[in-house]
């Protein structure tokens, strides 16, 4: 989602997504293939995952919870019908926050701005 997972996505070379965009980001974590790239898809997309494996089961990890799942299991992902309301101070904006946290436009050579 655009809100709350930007840092995780960035740490895996994923994109920055504006909070008002209605998208999901699928970002591979430590891919073994250089062709595995992040993907941005509409948030009304219904995602179905199916693992093709020679093993009898596989591990799935969601929000620090790990469980073993039989190999014929299908995983479905869709947007929740619930939303959250957030408070944004009048003197803050998404782009200003990014610029500050990611040091955009700053000259960080030789520790001059640290």
Task: State each model region's role.
Residues 6-114:
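Catalytic phosphate-donor-binding core of small-molecule kinases
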